Amino acid sequence: MKRNILLLFTFFACITVQGQTPVRLVDLRSEHLDRPIGLDNPVPRLSWRMEDGRQGAVQTSWRIVVDEDSLNVVNGCGRMWDSGKNDSRNQLVAYAGKKLQPFTRYYWKVICSDMEYKETASPVSYFETGMMGMQHWQGAWIGDGKDIHYGPAPYFRKEFKTGKKVKSARAYIAAAGLYELYINGEKIGDHCLAPLYTRFDRRNLYVAYDVTSQLQNGDNAIGVLLGNGWYNHQSKAVWDFDRAPWRNRPTFCLDLRITYTDGSVETIPTDLSWRTASGAITFNSIYTGEHYDARLEQKGWSTPEFDDSKWRGVAYRSVPSSNVTAQQVHPIRNVKIFPAVSFRKVDEKTYIYDFGQNMSGVTCIHVSGERGTEVRIKHGERLDRKSVV
């Protein structure tokens, strides 16, 4: 009997050992972001997690290698930085290698030792630097020449050609106000209400996008739509943002940096060659919403086939602040769709949809009707005495 118990114990011990999950290094991040582009920090912080399910598991050492060539990193070589082995449990480490250059992709990995001092290497990750200084901008700040009281949102466009094969392309856009960026009719990125709020007369944020796949051989077009955001409050409310010292008509600056397969680089900047016009958004306020007149839509306005002969020239604007830097945080995004949980008809013109919870978001509706019909959407957190929003 004792022999059978011993065999049974040995059997389960073997199962336990063989079933151990191998040590893995995961969630590699640069400045807390997953493979970011457009970093401005000259000493970005690199972080990771060790997955080790064993009791008493601990990291006993780390070593980081950084190089411009991913193959070198795979082979454990870091010409930009080889930290050497550090007997430490740290999993957040500031870069301490050679000076990083703007517009450059750097690959990196980490090699860690576990509690048994066995080494495990992570997959290769990367980060990509951005402007790293205002002196590298080529674009000028431009606007539509209107004042702070003008209601319609400004649309901007620029056509250009690519005569060679494109290796990569990055769009860098800074705005005072809000923006949406389009290339060849496609909205770029999944950002909402970008860039994020700052004290606009002291600091402005730019966002970098990989737009390689959006470019096409030959004719191309860029489109930018600006909104007032927190920069130009046309609605009076709490906190007196309508009297903010930075208040002005929205403006932006953009560099589209194209790298060709032959190694040459071309930049399409904002300048006086851009064109501007108004469109379907006749009013926008971060407090009181948006007025959209579908009769004023300019279909295809961000495509190269669009006729912009009725559009007008842009105007130069002064830089809102002397500090234009990368937005190195997670953006606002649409992350979940909430369908209405109930519906109630109040009268022939009023309907109430209840989504079952409080949230921040936008409403998506599909409507049809006679041209010029006005549809109003009002959001609220509670109903009044008449059970109306």
Give the predicted meaning of each segment.
Residues M1-R24:
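Bacterial Sec-dependent N-terminal signal peptides
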